[in-house]
Curated annotation (Swiss-Prot):
Primary site of residence: cytoplasm
The organism of origin for this protein: Buchnera aphidicola subsp. Cinara cedri (strain Cc)
Catalytic activity: an N-acyl-L-alpha-aminoacyl-tRNA + H2O = an N-acyl-L-amino acid + a tRNA + H(+)
Compartments reported by the entry: Cytoplasm
Role description: Hydrolyzes ribosome-free peptidyl-tRNAs (with 1 or more amino acids incorporated), which drop off the ribosome during protein synthesis, or as a result of ribosome stalling.
Catalytic machinery residues: H22 (proton acceptor)
Protein name: Peptidyl-tRNA hydrolase
């Protein structure tokens, strides 16, 4: 496994989706860029908002694709190709229906669990190599509600608080070693 050189938050670029469950990957990138005092700037050639910061002399790029979720892979591929970053050096941050709000899970592999943004990344890269995902729990809808509608709705106030607390705790827990290989071995679920 390689060191992390790029962190991408998956989401839909349309403004009305900013605070929805499906955009928690964007929430993560916004909070991380704020934590490291770096600002995201739109870069047309990468179809997304890009920034970078140094952590213990290791440069880490941040990316928020400016595309719909099912096209996020194109933005990820454009930035990673330009800077010669392998898929295995990318941390993909995304929402996860199978985890409750406030629970995070790091997973390593090539599975997408039905997530269209992750599918887009897998389909865009020629070599199907394992990569790291930070799955942010958003919970499942009650009473078999339509999942597509559920992920495009804003979470409740308490769920929003739990999700943001979990993100912040993860940022604090990983700030000293996210660039190290040891980070990749940690697949624990974090309860907040």
């Amino acid at each position: 496994m390689n060191k992390i050189k790029m962190i991408v938050g998956l989401g839909n670029s349309v403004y009305k989706y900013n605070q929805t469950r499906h955009n928690v990957g964007f929430w993560y990138i916004n909070m991380l860029s704020s934590f490291y005092k770096t600002s995201l700037k739109f870069k047309k050639k990468f179809s997304g908002y890009v920034s970078s910061f140094f952590l213990n002399n290791n440069k880490i790029f941040l990316l928020k694709p400016d595309l719909f979720m099912n096209l996020n892979g194109y933005s990820v591929f454009a930035l990673s190709s330009f800077y010669k970053i392998k898929l295995s050096e990318i941390l993909v941050v995304r929402d996860e229906l199978d985890l409750s709000p406030g629970i995070l899970k790091v997973k390593y592999g090539i599975g997408h669990n039905g997530h269209n943004g992750v599918k887009s990344i897998i389909n865009t890269f020629e070599k199907k190599k394992p990569f790291i995902q930070l799955c942010i729990g958003i919970g499942r809808p009650e009473f078999k509600k339509n999942v597509s509608n559920f992920v495009l709705e804003c979470p409740s106030k308490i769920d929003t608080i739990n999700i943001k607390k979990a993100i912040l705790k993860f940022i604090f827990l990983t700030k000293d070693y996210i660039y190290k290989k040891e980070f990749l071995k940690n697949k624990k679920i974090i309860l907040i």
